[in-house]
Amino acid sequence: MQKIAKQALSSLSSLAKSPANAMGSISHLPAYGHRLLPVLIDEISRDEPDRVLFYTPRNGQPSQGYDEVTTKIFANAIDRLCGWLDSQLGSPTVSKTIAYIGQNDLRYFIIMIASTKLGHRLLLSSPRNSVEGHVSLIKQSGCELWIASSGLGHHEFLQDLHIPSVEAPELSELLDPTLAKPYIYQKSWHEGKSDVLALLHTSGSTGLPKLVPVYLETAATVDGFHLMEPTDGKRPTGVEWTGTRQLCAMPLFHVAGICLGLYSAVFFNWIVVLPSVGPIMQHVIEDALDHISLDSAFISPSVLQDISKSSRVLEKLSKLKFITSAGGPIPQSVGDLIHPRVPIMQTMGMTEGQWLASVVMHPDEWAYYYFHPRTGVEMRPYSEDLFELVFVQNPKLSATQPVFKTFPDLDIWETKDLYSRHPKHPDLWKYEMRRDDLIILSNGEKFNPLAAEGKLISHPWIAAAYLTGRGRFQTAALIYPDDSSFNNSDDTIIDNIWPTFEEVNKSLPAFAQIHRDFVKIVRTPFPCTPKGTLARNETEKSFNADINAIYDRSTHGKPSVHINGTTEDVVRSGIREAIETVSGLVDLKDDDNIFTRGFDSLHVIRLAGLLSSAFYQPLEVEPGTIYTNPTISQLSHSVWTHLEYGPQDRIHHSEVTLEMLAKYIQAFEPPRESKEHIVLTGTTGEIGSYLLDDICKNDKVAKVWCLNRSVDAFQRQVDSAKSKGLSSNWQSKAKFVRYDVTSENLGLSQDDLEEIKNEATAIIHNAWEVNFNLPLSSFDPQFVGLQGLVDVCRATRHKIRFFFVSSISAAMNWPSDLLGPVPEASISRFDAPINGYGSSKLVAEHLLSKAARSGVLSLSVLRVGQVAGPVRTLGEGSIWTRRDWVPAIIDASVHLRALPLDLGSASILDWIPIDLLAEVIGQLVVPVNPVVGQENYYNLLNPRTPSWKDTLPGLKAHLEASFSEKFEIIPLQEWINRMRGAEKTIVKEVSEGSSETARRAQSGLKLLAFFETLASETEGSRGLEWSKANALAQSSILACMEPVSSAWFDTWLTQWGY
């Protein structure tokens, strides 16, 4: 125990010193998961005063440059606001609830910490809330003061509620570096963990918003990401991205903005770049990309949807290392356009559960999540193909389960979020929908509308799509057109987009398909949640008249403005009228910024559409034009210039040029090596025979050198292939070469050696002594042969891709209860092998790893599990060899007329048939998408794992039909005892030659000690799990492999003559 404790302390010390976890010059060991934000901010401001937390755009405009906000300035701003709050509320002798609503800037984070320091509760009500929503939250929270940034303070409902309102200090005032009066938060962890950081609220998508308190303890669970062990070498995203400079283009009052804005800067040492003020749209991202260097950007799916339609912005986005998104699923069509240009990393969060720890995925799996095991989530079946994400409280995971800080009385919290499992990787999950997103038609049929909506919005004329039909006989669609098509007639738009509907209908079940008569164009944007996703229930209510119109075959019109563009003054007057029409703003001055007066993204879209149809000559006013010209004077001048001189097409010309470059650039890339030349050792063995057959069928393989020790290997190979039903038509590719591990240059002739050195591209080392009883010292000849192959690699013209067929026995003693699943990585514990054979494989892995790291070769280690008999090849010799332990159990069971109820610790059947294993290895050796890296490890086990009990009924039925006798099913230990009791009878019958079943059962007697070992460990007692992500990613055959089944057992039993 003392040794374990010392190791644990050593690990903690290493963790504290590692760059990914270090907090600058702070010398003490951080209490990750128990750090109070107000204390931590003051601490790092003292110890690291010059560390940059944020970049904020000067005067809210990136074009004016950015101001650095260091820890010292941030902490000082918090103290300054504490003083201001004191002046408004008096000394904090009594905790009060205050509300803040403001421009999307750093003041949100400043007031959160300041109110917490003073013991007050801060309500953050979304600016998008309806009056009814604001009033409900004020009443729920007991709000006593409404604070707003300039231009957002006047709300009539506050007077009705007798709630005073006050304007917040400007951000520039708060960031003044002049030292403010310090306000010290002196509470310990236990004293302060229940203090409220902020009162957030649900989206209100299913009714009025409900309060969700975020406690300091809740925030600290995100800090607990530091405590999570790496998974396949990756830490949770927050820790993995330490030190990155990321644009946080999210609303800062929302949990997504708080997590990836405030928490990421303070807990994880990110440098967070805040967006320009105003609605977060495509131009906000582009402004930041144009004016500050970034590593990444955090962008909502709705904005990514707009970006995907602009080749100009996509080109700028491609300069980032990656982009992050959250708040909802990215439509497949949008992600498919973006991820070839820049990797997409999705994160998942929720108001009640903050930031859900996930691990960085391969860019090709951008649509999926890998949730870290320490989140304590379970995926519970909901319907045939859908699973619900459910949090299950686990006291051991207290520091990393925020949802149970929000709901401390719950043991289980159902998120109502539904996911589908990755078809190849069982631990990857794709978000599909909310439970209440399902549409149930009047005939009881139900379907998921989100995938269809995602395909629809891929059309450039569609900005948003909403499918409906709850309680109706037919699905209907509301379409909100994109800016580019907004001023077209409904019929024109439907004509243009209908081919996309036809494609969508192909993916929908017949009962859910959309008829042309059930499509309606709407000119008002759909209601959205604060995170930018479609608010389905609110949309259903808000567009009830339009929905009824579809079914009633009625239509509606829209307002219009007409502008005679003869002079710039006339244009200015018309634009003023248009702004008044869409927003109701009647007292605007020509130089007033419309966004500081309450203009939002919905107003922009309506104004753009209105102006695009307002003139007597063709004109398209894009939303971006309004954002970059936010005053009447600026907008009228831009429109007048367009009318007078025509559009400037330089940007369009640039986009066309880039598209032409992209079209032809691949033709000018250097050609890749098209054919493989492979050295394969041990082809006459069981695996080797099937492997030779598979790789010789591959058109990408030009030549195979078959290295065997026997002088008659060729004839043996031909006989084996014919017997097994394999092709022997490989002579044109295969060359048989005898080799000797004890001789110089492996005993190869000079011609053969030179040929291999000049032509070989890969080596598959399959030959190895298979004997589980030998000690490690007996495997010296194997290591001498391995050294000879590595020496060959040193002299080859091509860098050899070396595939070593290893074994899971190299890690069967892996302590998975302490270290988790056996990784697809180098095994550093030399007590992991189960026997001398496994030790020899582990030593070989390490020797080859040394060669790979020295640049001699690139290594792929293939850890093979239980190899079962073939299931596809039907030759007479195509049989599961009776020397194996599974056939031995069957032969013994036939003699006893009894089958064991379980196989003890081997009851989980992760077996791979030998012919399918050869195909899996073939995919790894000749991959569709080559893997980059000096070392790759693959655990080759069947990803689908039934138990022995699952196959037992079919096995029993087959044997009973074959022998016309009943077979018992008895516990494994009883079965072993019966075998021991039958030993004398079996030996006697074998000696007399009177019983074939006794002769076969004799092999079971030889393995009784092994069976005793299985019985001593009950089913699942070992708890050994194997990571398979790498293998599943590279082999579609393994990923789609069927589980061991009764049908497979029927094949094997037939092979054995039963």
From Swiss-Prot:
Q: Which residue intervals make up region (Adenylation (A) domain)? A: 43-365
State the top-level EC class.
transferase
Q: What applied role does this protein play in biotech?
A: Fusaric acid is phytotoxic to plants such as cotton and banana. It has been shown to induce programmed cell death in plants. In addition to a mild toxicity to animals, fusaric acid exhibits acanthamoebicidal, antioomycete, and antimycobacterial activities.
**Which positions does the record annotate as the modified residue O-(pantetheine 4'-phosphoryl)serine?**
S601
Q: What is its EC number?
A: 2.3.1.-
Ranges where the Carrier domain occurs: 566-643
Keywords (A to Z) from UniProt: Multifunctional enzyme, NADP, Oxidoreductase, Phosphopantetheine, Phosphoprotein, Transferase
Supply the induction statement: Expression is positively regulated by the fusaric acid cluster specific transcription factor FUB10. Expression is also positively regulated by the secondary metabolism regulator LAE1.
Q: Does the keyword Transferase apply?
A: yes
List the InterPro entries hit by this protein, alphabetically.
Answer: ACP-like_sf (IPR036736), Adenylate-forming_Reductase (IPR051414), AMP-binding_CS (IPR020845), AMP-dep_synth/lig_dom (IPR000873), ANL_N_sf (IPR042099), Far_NAD-bd (IPR013120), NAD(P)-bd_dom_sf (IPR036291), PP-bd_ACP (IPR009081)
Q: Name one Pfam family in it.
A: PP-binding
UniProt keyword annotation of Transmembrane helix present: no
Q: Name one GO molecular function term.
A: transferase activity
Pathway given in the UniProt record: Mycotoxin biosynthesis
Q: Domain of life here? A: Eukaryota
Query: Region (Thioester reductase (TR) domain) spans which residues?
Result: 680-921
Q: What does this protein do?
A: Non-canonical non-ribosomal peptide synthetase; part of the gene cluster that mediates the biosynthesis of fusaric acid, a mycotoxin with low to moderate toxicity to animals and humans, but with high phytotoxic properties. L-aspartate is suggested as fusaric acid amino acid precursor that is activated and further processed to O-acetyl-L-homoserine by cluster enzymes aspartate kinase FUB3 and homoserine O-acetyltransferase FUB5, as well as enzymes of the primary metabolism.
Copy the domain comment. Answer: Contains three distinct domains: an adenylation (A) domain that activates the substrate amino acid which is subsequently covalently linked as a thioester (aminoacyl-S-PCP) to the 4'-phosphopantetheine prosthetic group of the second domain, the peptidyl carrier protein (PCP) domain, as well as a thioester reductase (TR) release domain.
Protein name (database record):
Non-canonical non-ribosomal peptide synthetase FUB8
